């Protein structure tokens, strides 16, 4: 599966849980949340645009860092 890395403005465990919730709802993803560095690495066949739109549902500032 392709890996994608995103920067997400997460400040606490609650922020990380919000990211987990939207990604689990999307389905077809495996992900790792790096809260101290505010990064989310996602393994998924979904497009980076789909993943970005999904992460934007958290209300946090999100940017696509590129393939990993």
Curated annotation (Swiss-Prot):
The modification Phosphoserine is found at residue 47. Transmembrane segments: none annotated. Coiled coil: none annotated. Pfam families: HMA (PF00403). Keywords: Acetylation, Chaperone, Copper, Copper transport, Ion transport, Metal-binding, Phosphoprotein, Transport. Gene3D superfamilies: 3.30.70.100. One of its GO terms (biological process) is response to oxidative stress. Cu cation binds at residues 12, 15. The keyword Acetylation applies. Residues 1-63 form the HMA domain. The modification N6-acetyllysine is found at residue 60. GO terms for molecular function: ATPase binding; copper chaperone activity; copper-dependent protein binding; cuprous ion binding. InterPro entries: Copper_transport_ATOX1-like, Heavy-metal-associated_CS, HMA_dom, HMA_dom_sf. GO terms for cellular component: cytosol. The heavy-metal-associated domain (HMA) coordinates a Cu(+) ion via the cysteine residues within the CXXC motif. The transfer of Cu(+) ion from ATOX1 to ATP7A involves the formation of a three-coordinate Cu(+)-bridged heterodimer where the metal is shared between the two metal binding sites of ATOX1 and ATP7A. The Cu(+) ion appears to switch between two coordination modes, forming two links with one protein and one with the other. Cisplatin, a chemotherapeutic drug, can bind the CXXC motif and hinder the release of Cu(+) ion. Homodimer. Interacts with ATP7B. Interacts with ATP7A. Interacts (via dimer form) with SLC31A1 (via C-terminal domain); this interaction improves ATOX1 stability and controls intracellular Cu(I) levels. Belongs to the ATX1 family. Binds and deliver cytosolic copper to the copper ATPase proteins. May be important in cellular antioxidant defense. PANTHER family: COPPER TRANSPORT PROTEIN ATOX1. This is Copper transport protein ATOX1. It comes from Mus musculus (Mouse).
């Amino acid at each position: 599966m392709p890996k994608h890395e995103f920067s997400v403005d997460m400040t606490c465990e609650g922020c990380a849980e919000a990211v987990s919730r939207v990604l689990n709802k999307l389905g077809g993803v495996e992900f790792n949340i790096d809260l101290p560095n505010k990064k989310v690495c996602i393994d998924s066949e979904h497009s980076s645009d789909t993943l970005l739109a999904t992460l934007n549902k958290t209300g946090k500032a999100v940017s696509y860092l590129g393939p990993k």
